[in-house]
Amino acid sequence: DNCIRMGPVSSTYQDNRYWTMWKLPMFGCTDGSQVLSEIQACTKAFPDAYIRLVCFDANRQVQISGFLVHRPPSATDYRLPADRQV
């Protein structure tokens, strides 16, 4: 719909929905510090990459949350909410 109304619309990291996994999923993890330490280790190993955290519901077997936890310092695609437009 946006492409029809606005012409070609280009985004950056969102275009590719396939992300490389850092390690095996942390099924049964109940300690948030484990998750934070894995995020820290991944950021240290890949400082110039987007890092995304994805959370799943084990009972329903669906994704319940997913968001970026690290944006590389070299990224220039961020805009303040007031400066964003479609």
UniProtKB/Swiss-Prot annotation:
Listed name of the protein = Ribulose bisphosphate carboxylase small subunit, chloroplastic 2
Subcellular location per UniProt equals: Plastid, Chloroplast
* Record has Transport as a keyword: no
Gene3D superfamilies under this entry?
A: Ribulose bisphosphate carboxylase, small subunit
- A single Pfam family it belongs to is RuBisCO_small
Reading the lineage from the top rank, the first entry is Eukaryota
> What do we know about how this protein assembles, alone or with others?
Heterohexadecamer of 8 large and 8 small subunits.
Print the miscellaneous field: The basic functional RuBisCO is composed of a large chain homodimer in a 'head-to-tail' conformation. In form I RuBisCO this homodimer is arranged in a barrel-like tetramer with the small subunits forming a tetrameric 'cap' on each end of the 'barrel'.
Q: What does this protein do?
A: RuBisCO catalyzes two reactions: the carboxylation of D-ribulose 1,5-bisphosphate, the primary event in carbon dioxide fixation, as well as the oxidative fragmentation of the pentose substrate. Both reactions occur simultaneously and in competition at the same active site. Although the small subunit is not catalytic it is essential for maximal activity.
Q: Please report the organism this UniProt entry assigns to the protein.
A: Acetabularia peniculus (Green alga)
The Swiss-Prot or TrEMBL record describes its family as follows: Belongs to the RuBisCO small chain family.
GO cellular component labels: chloroplast
Q: Which GO terms describe its biological process?
A: photorespiration; reductive pentose-phosphate cycle
User: Is the keyword Chloroplast assigned to this protein?
Assistant: yes
User: Which UniProt key words apply to this protein?
Assistant: Calvin cycle, Carbon dioxide fixation, Chloroplast, Photorespiration, Photosynthesis, Plastid
Q: List the SUPFAM superfamilies hit by this protein, alphabetically.
A: RuBisCO, small subunit
Q: Which InterPro entries match?
A: RuBisCO_ssu (IPR024681), RuBisCO_ssu_dom (IPR000894), RuBisCO_ssu_sf (IPR036385)
